[in-house]
Amino acid sequence: FQGSMETQMTLMKMTDVVCDDLKARIGIDRAKGTYPGYHYMRLTLGEFIRHRYKVRDLAFGQLTEQFIHDYQAFAMEEKGYAIDTVRHHLAILKKICRLAYKKGYAEKCHFQHFALPKQSERTPRALSRESFEKIRDVEIPAYRKSHMLARDLFLFACYTGVSYADAVSITNENLYTDDNGALWLKYRRKKNEHRASVKLLPEALALLEKYKDETRETLFPIIHHPNMKRHMKALAALAGIKDDLCYHQARHSFASLITLEAGVPIETISRMLGHSDISTTQVYARVSPKKLFEDMDKFIEATKDFQLVL
């Protein structure tokens, strides 16, 4: 296991081997949808090593048990990934280390006893109409500019379904005008590279205009994710919302409150959110009791003149 970093098999090199092997097997014995998770794990792992160790790669002999704990914290706190995404990244890391040991590139099977975090059992929920209006209308002191920006980013996500990672990276190049003069937001999601397209509501356009700045490349100023979580907590307190408030709820609220309740087909919502599988959208777009009652009333009205024929 001696030798320079150029000649020995290292963590990032082994990660490349695993990712390239998976990519080559797509369509043979691996589905296309499995690759993005590995690809983004590789990007996050490389970023973590550069951030934490100030180098581009590590030898397997340099790894300690603390490494995987620090990587988990980086993915959750710095990158803001959901627990299920972090769990998937950690599982891939363990697989890479297990393969390196099996092939003789590592003297030990690193992280074999590390327990993966439990999958989230709590389904993220959309805001109620009442909570949404409280956040929209809450008065924020002028000196709380960061709170104001956090609230407006949250509202923009409610109106567009844009995730946090995408909201702070979209630029004017992502804005398109259609033949009818309507403005659209089109982008590739950071999480999986899937295309997302959504027509901008007047409320979303107003927020873009509010933060328009020719000297800045992105459409909105950037708030780092740990700060965003802190602002969300403060925003909930200001608005008088007792439940926890997280940015991702805005994406669910777009699916349920803004689009599904307005009669938008779930297939269209899926395209707007950039989902590859409509079953994912079905988790986001939950029918509210209000929507259920309205649909039942429509059904009863439409069938009131029907006669049962036996």
Residue ranges and their predicted role:
Residues 2-42:
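Short, aromatic/basic-rich helix-turn unit that serves as a nucleic-acid recognition element
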Residues 190-209, 213-234, 246:
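C-terminal catalytic core of Y-nucleophile DNA break-rejoin enzymes
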Residues 126, 189-193, 205, 225, ...:
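Catalytic-site neighborhood detector that most strongly recognizes the C-terminal catalytic loop/helix
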